[in-house]
Amino acid sequence: MFPGRKASESAAGAFGTTVASVKWDQLVQGVELPFHPDLKVPALSEVLLPVPRPERIADVEQSAHATVVARLAGDVTPGMTVAVGGGSRGLTDRVLLLRGVISGLRALGAEPFVVPAMGSHGGAKAEGQRAMLESLGMTEEAIGAEIRATMETVEVARTEDGMPLYLDRHAARADRIFPVNRIKPHTCFKGPIESGVTKMAVVGFGKQPGAAQIHACGPEEMRNRILNGIEALRATGRILGGVGTIESASGEVVRVEALTATDVGGAAEIELTDFAREMVPALPFPQIDVLIVEKGGKDISGTTMDPNVTGRFSVHGLADLAEPDVSTIVLLNITPVSGGNALGIGFADFIPVSLAEQIDWQKTYVNCFTAGIAGVRRSRMPMVLPTEDDCIKAALSMCGRAFDQPKRVVRIESTLHMTRCWVSDALLQELPAGAEIVA
């Protein structure tokens, strides 16, 4: 800022000119581009993809109840208060899962209640986190337990190198905590344990300060802090255990496993993480010119779109995947459950006005800020164009392939739903074994 210059004048006229201020209203309307008159969007063929299809769990509630009772029978004393972690992710059958966990703990004599265990999500506000649970169907009536929400935290332990461990005030007052989460590869770091029960215990239950101190560092240190954190937290005796679920590429629950305190962050969770990696859906093409994603959101991935699928991590110190090599990404929508939080919008290159209008920048920036180095590039604004068709045409025009060459285009529902995709003719000869073109 130049001394004595108003904010609105800081750029305009800086060199004695009368340049108009930035026209933000142009983004609201969407910028129109001069597309080649002969540009056409290629026709796409629907393809069923070969993905792992383990047997789904038919009754998630009963499975959760049974595994809790079987694994934790000797660890619960009558009247033990247990803070059960409810997350912001769109777990399949999440209400049934929590209800089964609650009933299982009650059957053992515990007195469970639910706390939002989601770091800074929900705008880093207690009412926002409660609202996020409710938007996912996790109301007190549905899960059969009281929900206690607060952003106040209590330091309960420190790692050997001095990092504090936090629990929210309600969880800290309980006899034990019990994280319940989907286990899957993480979007910011790689290790023996990534996203799952351990991360919810160390990060989710720690609210804003717990999340901020983990995400403040790079990918390798992030992994180490989480692993060291669970050791320190376990040593306090505050962890009863947890429940981890694994979903297939089609979004069906295929495993529900209760973990003891020793299992959380231990061999059992490592085994579940290895299994979860096998379930991660993949784009079966080494090079893609245009990837069209119909919807992203916090219930799909913490980063709106899962970089383990798109190949783009956009984190300093963490390399993008060699395959798929995606030239341009078009994101068409975000889910209502996201509440406008669009962390990860920076993965996209083009978005329509209809999506841009949904973004709550307060929520997005708070979440990105808490994510530290992982949030810097992921909050960048893509090109905003009037319509979905404009976005796709822009991607086709700017993907780096000559105008008269066939484009390698893939369209998916989301990075979580990958049992099928739609591809252009240029990719039909590269379909993997077992893929089936839908007539």
Please state what every model-predicted region is.
Residues 169, 182-373, 382:
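Catalytic cores of enzyme domains
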Residues 95, 111-127, 158:
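Active-site histidine-anchored catalytic micro-motif
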Residues 81-92, 113-120, 410:
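Short glycine-rich or small-residue beta-strand-to-loop segments that form or flank ligand, phosphate
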Residues 67-83, 106-107, 284-285:
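Glycine-rich phosphate/diphosphate-binding loops that line cofactor/substrate pockets in enzymes
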Residues 3-8, 15-30, 307-439:
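C-terminal non-catalytic interaction/assembly regions of soluble proteins
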Residues 92-112:
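Histidine-anchored nucleotide/phosphate-binding helix
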Residues 128-192:
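An acidic, phosphate/nucleotide-engaging active-site surface
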